From Swiss-Prot:
Provenance organism: Escherichia coli (strain SMS-3-5 / SECEC)
Catalytic activity: (S)-malate + NAD(+) = oxaloacetate + NADH + H(+)
Binding site for substrate: R81, R87, N119, R153
NCBIfam families tied to this protein: MDH_euk_gproteo
Catalytic activity, EC: 1.1.1.37
Protein name (record): Malate dehydrogenase
SUPFAM superfamilies: LDH C-terminal domain-like, NAD(P)-binding Rossmann-fold domains
Keywords per UniProt: NAD, Oxidoreductase, Tricarboxylic acid cycle
Lineage: Bacteria, Pseudomonadati, Pseudomonadota, Gammaproteobacteria, Enterobacterales
Family: Belongs to the LDH/MDH superfamily. MDH type 1 family.
Residues of the active site: H177 (proton acceptor)
Amino acids binding NAD(+): G7, A8, A9, G10, G11, I12, G13, D34, N94, I117, T118, N119, M227
Length: 312
């Protein structure tokens, strides 16, 4: 199993690469790519960690050598948020980066599963889909927007509030991956109940958690370490499913049946071909139904922006 990380010299990429080097199954290959000249050195640094994961780093304009034979490609390349920016302000720079990298994936490893981490995910996934479609290699079961950070944050905040072990809590999060499009389904967390006020406050905190980190870092960056952990969790789940493990479920942002929007984050059963089954979002509370209806315009606009970027 070969995993490629594109954007591997950045804050998320390095954290992700470290976690994959220590946690991928023995015999896996890990390939790091970034435009930055430091990238082969990041791979050398990680190669000193004693795990049975082969690692190589590549830099420069051409990602092809890193992508050859990849089964999973995780893309975190792009610029990070600064205070006062929201994820959509990143669009102007990151759209071009994602388009270029996905074009290279389409040429070199068209059958790979692709996880898009680069923000704004609501839009960059639509860009990736249109690029793959133009190249004639789009498979909607193999393209994912990685929203796992919303899930791990929800798990952490709920566990803190309710005095639970964080490992015992699993909150499904649906919709998209910015602002109001992030909808944690708190009504579906087993064995925990919330007041209306708690639901409103928690939902808001989960939606704004990225900003909490950007502000706390005081201009020095955005959420890189928790995002690295979230991306590793998703990537490792995907690898396990591709290798035939049964019953692997993760939420991610994928093209579905279009009931809510063309792309939508929901629980997915993963398998040897990527998405095996898009699972139902279940029964929503009145608060959640309302929030779902309220986000769809924003989500659809974000998606249209990505489609237009490629097709203009």
């Amino acid at each position: 199993m070969k995993v490629a990380v594109l954007g591997a010299a950045g804050g998320i990429g390095q954290a992700l690469a470290l976690l994959l080097k220590t946690q991928l199954p023995s015999g896996s290959e890990l390939s790091l790519y970034d435009i930055a000249p430091v990238t082969p050195g990041v791979a050398v640094d990680l190669s000193h960690i004693p795990t049975a994961v082969k690692i190589k780093g590549f830099s420069g304009e051409d990602a092809t050598p890193a992508l050859e034979g990849a089964d999973v490609v995780l893309i975190s390349a792009g610029v990070a948020r600064k205070p006062g920016m929201d994820r959509s302000d990143l669009f102007n720079v990151n759209a071009g980066i994602v388009k270029n990298l996905v074009q290279q994936v389409a040429k070199t490893c068209p059958k790979a599963c692709i996880g898009i981490i680069t923000n704004p995910v609501n839009t960059t996934v639509a860009i990736a889909a249109e690029v793959l479609k133009k190249a004639g290699v789009y498979d909607k079961n193999k393209l994912f927007g990685v929203t796992t950070l919303d899930i791990i944050r929800s798990n952490t905040f709920v566990a803190e509030l309710k005095g639970k072990q964080p490992g015992e809590v699993e909150v499904p999060v649906i919709g998209g991956h910015s602002g109001v499009t992030i909808l944690p389904l708190l009504s579906q967390v087993p064995g925990v109940s919330f007041t209306e006020q708690e639901v409103a406050d928690l939902t808001k905190r989960i939606q704004n958690a990225g900003t909490e980190v950007v502000e706390a870092k005081a201009g020095g960056g955005s959420a890189t370490l928790s995002m690295g952990q979230a991306a590793a969790r998703f990537g490792l789940s995907l690898v396990r499913a591709l290798q035939g493990e049964q019953g692997v479920v993760e939420c991610a942002y994928v093209e579905g049946d279009g009931q809510y929007a063309r792309f939508f984050s929901q629980p997915l059963l993963l398998g040897k071909n990527g998405v095996e089954e898009r699972k139902s979002i279940g029964t929503l509370s009145a608060f959640e139904k309302n929030a779902l209806e309220g986000m769809l315009d924003t989500l659809k606009k974000d998606i249209a922006l990505g489609e237009e970027f490629v097709n203009k």
